[in-house]
Amino acid sequence: MIYQSPTIQVELLEDNIAKLCFNAPGSVNKFDRETLASLDAALDSIKQQSNIQALVLTSGKDTFIVGADITEFLGLFAQDDAVLLSWVEQANAVFNKLEDLPFPTASAIKGFALGGGCEAILATDFRIADTTAKIGLPETKLGIIPGFGGTVRLPRVIGADNALEWITTGKDQRPEDALKVGAVDAVVAPEALEAAAIQMLKDAVAEKLDWQARRQRKMSPLTLPKLEAMMSFTTAKGMVFAVAGKHYPAPMAAVSVVEQAATKGRSDALQIEHQAFIKLAKTDVAKALIGIFLNDQLVKGKAKKAGKLAKDVKSAAVLGAGIMGGGIAYQSASKGTPIVMKDIAQPALDLGLGEAAKLLSAQVARGRSTPEKMAKVLNNITPALDYAPVKHADVVVEAVVEHPKVKAQVLAEVEQYVSEDAIIASNTSTISINLLAKSMKKPERFCGMHFFNPVHKMPLVEVIRGEHSSEETIASVVAYASKMGKTPIVVNDCPGFFVNRVLFPYFAGFNGLLAEGGDFAAIDKVMEKQFGWPMGPAYLLDVVGLDTGHHAQAVMAEGFPDRMGKSGNDAIDVMFENKRLGQKNGKGFYAYSVDSRGKPKKDVDPTSYELLKAAFGEQKAFDADEIIARTMIPMIIETVRCLEEGIVASPAEADMGLVYGLGFPPFRGGVFRYLDTMGVANFVALADKYAHLGGLYQVTDAMRTLAANNGSYYQA
């Protein structure tokens, strides 16, 4: 053994080829500080051995290296620039040491080689991947750029255009795609990986492969004619900005870094990367996006833990077909859990099966599935007009019409047919789980399971704990949601649960602006372009449906009369009463037609303005700051109330619910990250300016205390 640490082992193989194996404690390898220090020491030990002729990097895990340890980032990025620069320079010195070894080097890549893992393989002369490999630089998704030489080496290995696509999108690349552009030199079967890498090194030692020329190319400026370079980078900037927009600076910064470094050798090019990395690491966007990544890990970790208490769900059932039932059935079946889809009407079953078939056909058309897989998934969905096939289900999801009496009746019925230990969940967006539980003989096996529409696209599932729901019930539904490929958050029962409870105060703020003459299209523009929502409030209401919005608003007003009660008609009422239901009937705030691709196309409709003018008078202009304040303050305060009341367990889960359930702008990180970035005291001062508008604008006592103590919701 040449070198051994808890994370890295180096041994000498035959033919004087050294093998460096990353094998940290835990399930994956990461480039944390300990591993970087170990790699540095391992390389020193290797350099001291005079007989070594080549080096192969391998992994003792199912995956190579998943990247840097992101849990270290927020603390590290909060340090002074000098400390951060020192860390980046030290890490790069290690990668340079690997690249500068006096003999050929190769990486044997299996599973993920992402971020720092990808940058490590770029520092070797040869790269061999197996068929399981996924290679990429996802840093821009975290609001930063590669910091261990990725922007310098990748363009010199695969060309600037290919490198910019990899870096700015942050996507994982399949081995065959990596081979096509020259990021890897061969793709082999997993069992042949190490042998193939060693053979390539033997060929290099025997001078059949010119490893020194490859290395020199990575040290040198890019070989791009000046005019071609200018055109290439100008085009890239336009394309990247069109996708990333002004709220996500990292992809544009990556283009700029590659452009500036193109004419430089390795040392100067790395300095350009370091400076850009540090600048981005200090941004609020990086803090928000890294926070989302860490929050996602926390939520998924909780779900994994719940799996230990969960009942094994081998089969499921959904009651109520149609679009929603079909979406749930598709999601369950496509992830491997057979499901019965039960309805009282054959046309509804046909619609549900049609929805599943449509989603599967789209996957086949995009090359993401095959006709054989499609047939297998459809065979996992059993349509039924009676309860007989439901009796074997481990979990039953009730998804009938959103009406308390109908749901209560269906829940009471199905309980008679299922096994004693079957779990029953209601897919409801507004109806109290405690109320529905009253229709059950065994309320401990019952909870809420709120899917968001469209089911196949929306990642969030709210699992709603009723006062009688058992821990096994909650754990089993969380585990089933995870098995379906969803991100579950557990919330306690209250009107609107968590997501709808915080959404409708936002709509109330919007209604308030319209009642004073605000222009809904202007408000949408501000909330989309400036705040960053995927849809403004008017457009979102049209997509949700004004009938659904009208009903949910009434539920919220009844549940929280002090804050959400209404004294008269608002804009939602005006649209609903004039049968303007949104996209579903072609007219809401906007008018809708179908474009050439069959998608709804939105247009301004003068009729909407006439109706609103008749109800609320002449239009009045509001500036962007006031629009943002008056819509967002109610949502933010209601989110804080949900945390204080224990409806949601943590700021992390609340923020993930907002990002995954509502499309809260990821670059802002969620309500609690947004509050911490803004400063709780600054927010309280802003809210106090609007406190005269009513209870939705009045902060809680606990918020005032936190503000007075200069506190925050996240611990840095």
Swiss-Prot record:
The record places the site described as Important for catalytic activity at E119, E139
Q: List positions binding NAD(+).
A: M324, D343, V400, V401, E402, K407, S429, N453
Pathway note: Lipid metabolism; fatty acid beta-oxidation
List, alphabetically, the InterPro entries matched.
3-OHacyl-CoA_DH_CS, 3-OHacyl-CoA_DH_NAD-bd, 3HC_DH_C, 6-PGluconate_DH-like_C_sf, ClpP/crotonase-like_dom_sf, Enoyl-CoA_hydra/iso, FA_oxidation_alpha_subunit, FadB
Per its record, the protein catalyses: a (3S)-3-hydroxyacyl-CoA + NAD(+) = a 3-oxoacyl-CoA + NADH + H(+); a (3S)-3-hydroxyacyl-CoA = a (2E)-enoyl-CoA + H2O; a 4-saturated-(3S)-3-hydroxyacyl-CoA = a (3E)-enoyl-CoA + H2O; (3S)-3-hydroxybutanoyl-CoA = (3R)-3-hydroxybutanoyl-CoA
For the region Enoyl-CoA hydratase/isomerase, what residue ranges are annotated? Answer: 1-189
The reply on keyword Signal is no
**GO biological process terms, semicolon-separated:** fatty acid beta-oxidation
PROSITE patterns on file = 3HCDH
Q: Which UniProt keywords apply?
A: Fatty acid metabolism, Isomerase, Lipid degradation, Lipid metabolism, Lyase, Multifunctional enzyme, NAD, Oxidoreductase
Gene3D superfamilies named among the record's database cross-references: 1.10.1040.50, 2-enoyl-CoA Hydratase, Chain A, domain 1, NAD(P)-binding Rossmann-like Domain
Active site, renumbered:
H450 (for 3-hydroxyacyl-coa dehydrogenase activity)
Record's CDD domains?
crotonase-like (cd06558)
Q: Which HAMAP family match?
A: FadB
Annotated function: Involved in the aerobic and anaerobic degradation of long-chain fatty acids via beta-oxidation cycle. Catalyzes the formation of 3-oxoacyl-CoA from enoyl-CoA via L-3-hydroxyacyl-CoA. It can also use D-3-hydroxyacyl-CoA and cis-3-enoyl-CoA as substrate.
Please give the name of this protein: Fatty acid oxidation complex subunit alpha
